[in-house]
């Protein structure tokens, strides 16, 4: 049995048999399909991912004890509007634990690497991803912090866990950050040169970090970039 959806050069091709038999398989072939569309189909709206997915997904025993796996490449992959490069990801799902296990690697220009491993569980409505970042763009902060920061052009290296209920996601870890960002209220740009920031529940903490203005003058910043489950960001710096 075959079914297909086409739009210009994009398509979804579905082929196979959906039965209780573990030997019967449904194959879904994707070509340049918008990730936002796919996530909408499974009602995932906790955070925004985008890009164009090409690859194969397979499902077995869909009316018995279903299993599924996929191998996908996502071009122009973004998280909350922030660029992360091209993502290669393997995923598998088993109904017994209800989790989608993820093993992904995003490669961006400038030898930026983001390694992603863990799971998302639609059944339990939770997430646990371990992310190793090497000079990863943090452009997504432009979405979260647009009320008080602008033109955020920073990069992070470190390890961060994305954990918690899907409606209350938290970031936990530590990263070295470098790059520039503008403070809207001061109409001034500042530069970080590899100091550490600490990610704790509902808080991103700066401890004695060095910052530089456009003339190279040094300042020391301590403070907090607070949020509520990755929303309603605010800051308290001195």
Q: Where are the predicted features?
A:
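Interface amphipathic segments
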Residues: 1-161, 166-238
